[in-house]
């Protein structure tokens, strides 16, 4: 029998931590926040339902739980995503970034035994991509990337030697925008049958908001990724293309690799996309501006911010800060946490051995953080390092400097 007292303790802890989380400042680059509007479907009955009939075929209602709101997916979600990406073909069914990766790779990689090229994890590629390719029966080849530029000499060698079916550009750890057009040019010159897919999970919101270039405009055949990093959506994935045949190939792979596509989350993605159509451009521009300002302020306070020889710190949402050894890094990470500020520690960032704070400014921006909030945040980092103002209210001081959020506050 369930111990109800124990259950009460768990619920009390959950609720108290949830209240605390409402005032926290989250600086994890791979996380963001759902707006109140986008959260609505997650508390609805549709969280419990399947939905397969996206063609709205009147003779195919085998699962009727979502019938009355089907257009929220087939029109609201798909239409807004399509307009944001300027891509007529959208697959909104992946349930995560890795789910989108698996579907894209299976649909576009050709027959087992062929080669899939991805970005070397040591230079910022996703840790799972090469292994995913091998598990799906492909040979894996990797290319290095430096400051957003794929090593062209290495890529030419791979294209000529392996004639790969697919190049899967999966840059996750980067302070630079990925250069896609040069890769597309090389593919066109050396291996015309090779397809080019760009996984822009980390920069999805910056791409769809127009602050970074659209890979499809730069020559990519397809693009996709997760929808909860710089894009303020639910934990889902999405795939885009302008080519009907490639859309169908990914659709066929998805059909055999994914059953439940998490209907409520897909409705949440639709509402988030509708909001993003309104707020997205201003939000995306503010994210990059905030990241660059935060880098400058931290450097002026004596923090070791990753900086190129030309002074460049970031053109994405990511800021990298070297604190010291593992003990020193953990100490300041815990101190910031005690202030209500949550940071991400990584030990494998390109060109920065050892533990590093990998910081992202997207969520703070989404809830209304602009210049004043970024200045307040930099002061709290200095407080945490110096061990002063240890009152647990650092995040509240930052949040008090936030203005209007980049989402609707009042809705019908």
From Swiss-Prot:
Its cofactor is pyridoxal 5'-phosphate. Gene3D superfamilies: Aspartate Aminotransferase, domain 1, Type I PLP-dependent aspartate aminotransferase-like (Major domain). Pathway: Antibiotic biosynthesis. The modification N6-(pyridoxal phosphate)lysine is found at residue 229. It comes from the Bacteria. GO terms for molecular function: glycine hydroxymethyltransferase activity; pyridoxal phosphate binding. Belongs to the SHMT family. Transaldolase involved in the biosynthesis of the capuramycin-type nucleoside antibiotic A-102395. Catalyzes the condensation of L-threonine and uridine-5'-aldehyde to form 5'-C-glycyluridine (GlyU). This is L-threonine:uridine-5'-aldehyde transaldolase. It comes from Amycolatopsis sp.
